[in-house]
């Protein structure tokens, strides 16, 4: 089984071919292809290549499946004994991708 570790949106993801993944929002239309050049690690069965900091010439190709928003995260701030409460919420945008290829 081959897999890779990529960096996008300030986070690291372990990906394998055929996987679906929700990442931070990318400004790419649905159905288009996107390439990730920042590959930290590539593993093909027995052989593992670790970059310093990235693997030279390695890329991961993915197809954008959809764009959307995560479930709402609710935040409550309050001051004790002051009868004051503030309720807020946040929904983060995401891009869902399907990994179509790992090239090392």
UniProtKB/Swiss-Prot annotation:
Matching PROSITE patterns: RIBOSOMAL_L21
- The gene name on file is rplU
Source organism per UniProt: Pseudomonas putida (strain ATCC 47054 / DSM 6125 / CFBP 8728 / NCIMB 11950 / KT2440)
One annotated GO molecular function: structural constituent of ribosome
Q: What's the protein called, per UniProt?
A: Large ribosomal subunit protein bL21
Assembly behavior: Part of the 50S ribosomal subunit. Contacts protein L20.
Q: Name one GO cellular component term.
A: ribosome
Which NCBIfam families has this protein been placed in? L21
Biological process (GO) annotations held by this record are:
translation
Q: Which family does it belong to?
A: Belongs to the bacterial ribosomal protein bL21 family.
- Tell me the superkingdom of the source: Bacteria
Keywords on record? Ribonucleoprotein, Ribosomal protein, RNA-binding, rRNA-binding
Q: Which InterPro entries match?
A: bL21-like, bL21-like_sf, Ribosomal_bL21, Ribosomal_bL21_CS
Q: Which PANTHER family match?
A: 50S RIBOSOMAL PROTEIN L21, LARGE RIBOSOMAL SUBUNIT PROTEIN BL21M
| Pfam families recorded | Ribosomal_L21p
Q: What does this protein do?
A: This protein binds to 23S rRNA in the presence of protein L20.
